[in-house]
């Protein structure tokens, strides 16, 4: 009878280490590829966000300019008419020539229903003020959407600072606009004029902020 001796099988460390190395390389390649994809998507999202923010700011700026012009006219009209008001904004003490001049400068601001001759050619006019308050729609949809995309770290710090500062001031302006609309609804004209005067200052500042952001928005993509 012949006997065979089983030899001890050697463990192949080189093979095992090679497999481990391949797995390690594979994992790192997968991580790198995922990071590359995420970075590529973030850059693409950032470009879209900048485009949408630019469009939003331009539209808001146009809305603000229209409202600013209209509401500034209201302030001018009130400042000239208030010296002619007789106790309230329903009664006006003026000559026909003065009324014609005021109406030509500020059409529709005061509408006469009847008049009574007093003396020296002065009439007491009975009527009422009619104010068309321009309410701008100042959006921040693009900015809010950008903040939900987790791409703010892709933006330059100065760019982020300017954007947040601009939208913060815009919210303050919107709050004052709402106050103005409420004062008009309640026919609180003195309060309305105070608010519009304050808004006049805020609007100029916001308009400058819009201009600054639009001039520097391309730097956000650097």
Describe the function of each predicted region:
Residues 17-32:
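Hydrophobic membrane-insertion alpha-helices, especially the h-region
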């Amino acid at each position: 009878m012949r006997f065979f001796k089983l030899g001890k099988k050697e463990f192949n460390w080189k093979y095992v280490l090679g497999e481990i190395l391949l797995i390690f390389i594979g994992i790192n390649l997968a991580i790198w590829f995922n990071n590359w994809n995420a970075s590529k998507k973030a850059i693409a999202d950032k470009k879209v966000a900048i485009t949408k923010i630019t469009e939003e700011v331009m539209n808001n700026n146009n809305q603000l300019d229209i409202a600013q012009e209209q509401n500034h006219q209201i302030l001018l009209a009130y400042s000239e008419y208030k010296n002619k008001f007789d106790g309230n904004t329903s009664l006006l003490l003026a000559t026909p020539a003065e009324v014609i001049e005021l109406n030509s400068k500020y059409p529709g601001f005061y509408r006469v229903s009847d008049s009574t001759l007093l003396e020296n050619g002065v009439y007491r006019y009975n009527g009422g003020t009619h104010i068309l308050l321009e309410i701008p729609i100042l959006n921040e949809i693009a900015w809010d959407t950008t903040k939900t995309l987790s791409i703010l770290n892709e933006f330059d710090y100065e760019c982020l600072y300017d954007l947040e500062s601009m939208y913060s001031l815009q919210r303050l302006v919107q709050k004052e606009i709402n106050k103005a609309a409420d004062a008009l609804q309640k026919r609180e004209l003195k309060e309305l004029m105070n608010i519009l005067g304050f808004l006049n200052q805020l609007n100029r500042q916001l308009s400058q902020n819009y201009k600054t952001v639009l001039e520097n928005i391309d730097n956000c993509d650097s």
